[in-house]
Amino acid sequence: MMKGGLAGLMKQAQQMQEKMKTAQAELAALEVNGQAAGGLVKVAISGKYELKRVQIDPGAMDDREMLEDLIVTAYTEAFKQVEAASTQLMSGATAGMPMPPGFKLPF
């Protein structure tokens, strides 16, 4: 019985590994947008948190400190979207596998 249980667990782990690869590929292809001040500043980041684009409305260029804050705000918004997508994709990949409390994927 122990052998069958172990084989089942190994099969489940292999399935989870395949689902994880798929989820990671989806994350790598993901691109999300964040914006601040009604679109004065827009950023696009990848599912790997890489900054892809920054668009700044000319009206936001007058105040450097405000512009810096708007860039951070737009990036933070996009970052949160990637976090949510990552959590959703990874929870789907690990569905049915017991995970320790606080265990976060991807590593």
Swiss-Prot record:
GO terms for cellular component: bacterial nucleoid; cytosol. The keyword DNA-binding applies. GO terms for molecular function: DNA binding. It is found in: Cytoplasm, Nucleoid. Disulfide bonds: none annotated. Keywords: Cytoplasm, DNA-binding. Homodimer. Binds to DNA and alters its conformation. May be involved in regulation of gene expression, nucleoid organization and DNA protection. Belongs to the YbaB/EbfC family. This is Nucleoid-associated protein Pnuc_0701. It comes from Polynucleobacter asymbioticus (strain DSM 18221 / CIP 109841 / QLW-P1DMWA-1) (Polynucleobacter necessarius subsp. asymbioticus). The lineage of its organism: Bacteria, Pseudomonadati, Pseudomonadota, Betaproteobacteria, Burkholderiales.
